[in-house]
Regions:
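Conserved structural motif at the start of ABC-family nucleotide-binding domains
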Residues: 3-5, 18
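ABC-type ATPase nucleotide-binding domains, specifically the catalytic core motifs of the NBD
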Residues: 13, 69, 94-110, 121-123
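Short beta-strand immediately N-terminal to the Walker A/P-loop
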Residues: 17, 31-32, 81
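The feature captures the beta-strand-to-loop junction immediately N-terminal to the Walker
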Residues: 34-36
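Helix-to-loop junction immediately C-terminal to a conserved catalytic motif
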Residues: 49
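Conserved ABC transporter NBD signature motif
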Residues: 57-64, 77, 110-115
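Conserved ABC ATPase signature
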Residues: 132-136, 140
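ABC ATPase C-loop
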Residues: 149-150
């Protein structure tokens, strides 16, 4: 099991935003969270990443309990969100954007290997390495946001 969420409960004051949410994601599996505005999709993701406080519930990533880890430690576990709107650094190059994805890491050889993995997944980014990210098409910007998350 890659990600396991058990009995997640989140409240905003008196409003119960999540009530006992549980789900599993296996390696290689793709799931979707579907619901109307205010249904709790973003709250669920923010809870998993510990960007908001949970009242109760447990979260396991790759077999490790990450329920109480801080958001930066969760990122170090390689559990990353790529939000809507891409949120790239438009005035920086594609290369600089990708490098920012590895800012918490020190192992240069590992960073280089991960960069090559990104280029295998998104060869277009390698072609545009020196280009300003803001000049990429919308799809290319989404590739860049995902590539940065993989770094």
């Amino acid at each position: 099991m890659m990600l396991e969420v058990k009995d997640l409960n989140v409240s905003y004051g008196a409003i119960k935003a999540l009530k006992g949410i549980s789900f599993n994601v296996d390696e290689g599996e793709i799931i979707t969270l579907i619901g109307s505005n205010g249904a709790g999709k973003t709250t669920t993701l923010h809870s998993v990443s510990n960007l908001i406080k949970k009242q109760s519930g447990t979260i396991f990533f790759e077999g490790n309990d990450i329920t109480t880890l801080t958001a930066d430690k969760i990122v170090r576990q390689h559990l990353i969100q790529v939000p809507d709107g891409r949120r790239i650094f438009a005035n920086l190059s594609v290369k600089e954007n990708l490098e920012l994805g590895a800012f918490l890491r020190n192992d240069k050889a590992e960073i280089k290997r991960d960069l090559e993995k990104v280029f295998v997944l998104f060869p277009r980014l390698k072609e545009r390495l020196k280009q300003n990210a803001g000049t990429l098409s919308g799809g290319e910007q989404q590739m860049l946001a995902m590539g940065r998350a993989l770094m």
